[in-house]
């Protein structure tokens, strides 16, 4: 189990990412655009740097919904490999079963 504070930190990051997503996208579009002047581009870079660090989507970490485990996370199910295996063995995941060949 991950610490409660770590789970809370990830929730806070997710909220910040959602809050600043449009602003970040607009600033990045200005930076990448060949039509924008050097002054506009530099101004956009400074504004982007002024945004909260945790508002960047790359800082968000996928975590297991049940345990908060950061490694072995499977996006399709939202669970870590361990919890997915346990749920599969109980028959809670439709269409998923233990492999045998």
Curated annotation (Swiss-Prot):
MF term (GO), any: rRNA binding
Alphabetically ordered keywords of this record: Ribonucleoprotein, Ribosomal protein, RNA-binding, rRNA-binding
GO biological process, any: translation
Disulfide partners: none
InterPro entries per the UniProt record, alphabetical: Ribosomal_uS14 (IPR001209), Ribosomal_uS14_bac/plastid (IPR023036), Ribosomal_uS14_CS (IPR018271)
Pfam families assigned: Ribosomal_S14 (PF00253)
Cellular compartments per GO CC: cytoplasm; small ribosomal subunit
The family this protein is said to belong to: Belongs to the universal ribosomal protein uS14 family.
Subunit structure of this chain's protein: Part of the 30S ribosomal subunit. Contacts proteins S3 and S10.
Function: Binds 16S rRNA, required for the assembly of 30S particles and may also be responsible for determining the conformation of the 16S rRNA at the A site.
Name of the molecule in the record: Small ribosomal subunit protein uS14
Lineage, opening ranks: Bacteria, Pseudomonadati, Pseudomonadota, Gammaproteobacteria, Alteromonadales
Gene from which this protein is expressed: rpsN
């Amino acid at each position: 189990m991950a610490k409660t504070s770590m789970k809370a930190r990830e929730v806070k990051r997710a909220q910040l990412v959602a809050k600043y997503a449009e602003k970040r996208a607009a600033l990045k579009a200005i930076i990448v655009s060949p039509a924008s002047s050097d002054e506009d581009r530099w101004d956009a870079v400074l504004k982007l740097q002024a945004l909260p660090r945790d508002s960047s989507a790359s800082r968000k970490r996928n975590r297991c919904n049940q345990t908060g485990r950061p490694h072995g996370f499977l996006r399709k199910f939202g669970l870590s490999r361990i919890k997915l295996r346990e749920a599969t063995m109980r028959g809670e995941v439709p269409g998923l079963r233990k492999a045998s060949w």
